[in-house]
Amino acid sequence: MHVHVVEHPLAAARLTTLRDARSDNAAFRTALRDLTLMLVYEATGSVPVESSTVRTPVAETTGYRLANPPLLVPVLRAGLGMVDQAHALIPEARVGFVGMARDEDTWQPTPYLESLPADLSAQPVFVLDPMLATGGSMVYTLELLHARGAADITMLCVVAAPQGVTAIQECAERFGPSTSVRLFTATIDEGLNDAAYIVPGLGDAGDRQFGPR
């Protein structure tokens, strides 16, 4: 599995805003949108393109577009804050949804929504989730996508914990070499606290975007 940490001054600045407990909901959402743009930009750097001839006001030239735009899959509810900006950069992309809630006693994911195409065998997928903590929600999502035939899966996360990275690496190994799994993140933090929150992290990304449940 390929893991790429986006190292850029602008990404670091937006991450600082997300971490800052003084940032209100609006500031948090704005920083998340900006950082999502950077993650998508990095993640699409090597995707296949197809060429075509276009005419400018003065001449013909060669233009390019994505050969096979990805399916965007935000993991609800925190992933909602990433999907609009990802869609803005890839307007031809389709969008699916996976809804997940965390059991605060067991820390295990409780799925409540799956809205995905039945056949993903020829479809690249971008999974959008700001936080990769224990990895439970992401592993569930990866397994769901793999069961539908997805063989090219890219995860975009703002903050990751080593435990979560290990969990998805083990999941990718179970899929075997026929499935490509990549992670793009702005940082890999120190670890998890006793409540399974990322440290230093940025708190609950859903609450900080939309308010408490």
Curated annotation (Swiss-Prot):
It is an enzyme of class 2 (transferase). Pathway: Pyrimidine metabolism; UMP biosynthesis via salvage pathway; UMP from uracil: step 1/1. Its EC number is 2.4.2.9. The keyword Manganese does not apply. InterPro entries: PRibTrfase_dom, PRTase-like, Upp_B, UPRTase/APRTase, Ura_phspho_trans. The keyword Isomerase does not apply. It catalyses: UMP + diphosphate = 5-phospho-alpha-D-ribose 1-diphosphate + uracil. GO terms for molecular function: GTP binding; magnesium ion binding; uracil phosphoribosyltransferase activity. Binds 1 Mg(2+) ion per subunit. The magnesium is bound as Mg-PRPP. Its cofactor is Mg(2+). 5-phospho-alpha-D-ribose 1-diphosphate binds at R77, R102, D129, P130, M131, L132, A133, T134, G135, G136, S137, D204. Uracil binds at I198, G203, D204, A205. It comes from the Bacteria. GO terms for biological process: UMP salvage; uracil salvage. Catalyzes the conversion of uracil and 5-phospho-alpha-D-ribose 1-diphosphate (PRPP) to UMP and diphosphate. Belongs to the UPRTase family. This is Uracil phosphoribosyltransferase. The lineage of its organism: Bacteria, Bacillati, Actinomycetota, Actinomycetes, Mycobacteriales.
